[in-house]
Amino acid sequence: MNLIIGTSGKIGTYYQKFSKLKNNIYTSRKIKLKNNFKFDFTKNKFLPFFKKFNFKSVVLFSSISDPMQCKNNTILSKKVNITYTKKLLNFLMKNNIYFIFFSSEYIYPGKKNKIYIEKLNYVSKMIYAN
């Protein structure tokens, strides 16, 4: 069984629509979507949810990626994008659950025609990335 977290965003919605895998459980923090569980990892506990379904892998699309939403609600964006993402990833590693984590492109400054190197430090547009 695979858990797909964050299916209310663009990439998660696309993934859900076109995934050929049959054993997926989809979750969204914000809204109840068709074929989805509404599950907010910032409010609910991981362990009971994971025990119930015995997940073998997790695909994580969940984030607040809109720069204005992050700027206007710094506490929630830090909670979702950093604090609970770290807790979830630590939980997955501790329990040997394979995961794929998609991250925001907004970590980089966004200058056109510039090649970014992950090892270097940049000043990000996003408040929680600096």
Q: What are the residue ranges of the model-derived segments?
A:
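N-terminal Rossmann NAD(P)H-binding glycine-rich loop of SDR-like oxidoreductase domains
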Residues: M1-L21
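Short, polar loop motifs at secondary-structure junctions
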Residues: T7-K10, I25-L33
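Rossmann-fold cofactor-recognition segment
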Residues: R29-K45
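SDR active-site strand-loop-helix element
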Residues: I5, T27, V58-S62, F99-E105
